[in-house]
């Protein structure tokens, strides 16, 4: 089992954890259907940037 040579300070622990923050996902509204969707993704009904790209 790995054992550290010396105790890590609160500062070093905080610096390591500085990249662990969660961000909210970017959501946008489709111009045609008005449906909310993730950015750079097709909506549930098949629209992307105002155009129908998936026919069901």
From Swiss-Prot:
Q: Does the keyword Nucleotide-binding apply?
A: no
Q: Which GO terms describe its molecular function?
A: structural constituent of ribosome
Record field: compositional bias (Basic residues): 1-16
Keyword presence, Ribosomal protein: yes
**Pfam families listed in its UniProt record:** Ribosomal_L32p
Q: Please give the biological process terms from Gene Ontology that the record holds.
A: translation
According to the record, the signal peptide region is none
InterPro entries assigned: Ribosomal_bL32, Ribosomal_bL32_bact, Ribosomal_zn-bd
Superkingdom of the source? Bacteria
Region: Disordered, residue numbers: 1-33
Polar residues composition-biased segments: 21-33
UniProt KW keywords: Ribonucleoprotein, Ribosomal protein
GO cellular component annotations of the record = large ribosomal subunit
HAMAP family xref list:
Ribosomal_bL32
Q: What's the family?
A: Belongs to the bacterial ribosomal protein bL32 family.
Q: What is the protein's name according to its record?
A: Large ribosomal subunit protein bL32
């Amino acid at each position: 089992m790995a054992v550290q040579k010396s105790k890590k300070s609160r500062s070093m622990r905080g610096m390591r954890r500085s990249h662990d923050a969660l961000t909210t996902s970017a959501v946008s509204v489709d111009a045609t259907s008005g449906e909310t969707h993730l950015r750079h993704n097709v909506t549930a009904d098949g629209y992307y940037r105002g155009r129908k790209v998936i026919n069901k």
